[in-house]
């Protein structure tokens, strides 16, 4: 199973992420816009940074970057999930997508469920919460 970690700009369970990353659980790590700061804070350089970078305020350097315009039909998290799938991920752990603004949390949960319906196993990890969406037809 190819597992990616996506890190967004919301509350971030850095201890859990660092433990999983240190154990080699992820084949790749993607920073989603402001999630780049969260990763920098724990000393992790992502394999890819993706987004319009309105939350971060600058385009990161020193890593592969996919920049999108602020006016778009998909959220940065949706673009990151799509990119993970395009690169071969069949499982994704999402950090920094729960907590914070309720509208963003609900939108992310709907987004994760949508990707699970299309074959991706998705787990969202918050500071105090966890949501797991399994691939349709699996377990």
Where do the model's predicted regions map?
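Short phosphate-binding loop-to-helix
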Residues: 65-87
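Short, acidic/small-residue loops that bind anionic groups at enzyme active sites
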Residues: 114-130
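Conserved small/polar residues in nucleotide/adenosyl-binding loops
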Residues: 133-139
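N-terminal beta-strand-loop-alpha-helix module at the start
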Residues: 1-58
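Short Gly/Thr/Asp-enriched flexible loops that form oxyanion-binding sites at enzyme active sites
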Residues: 103-113
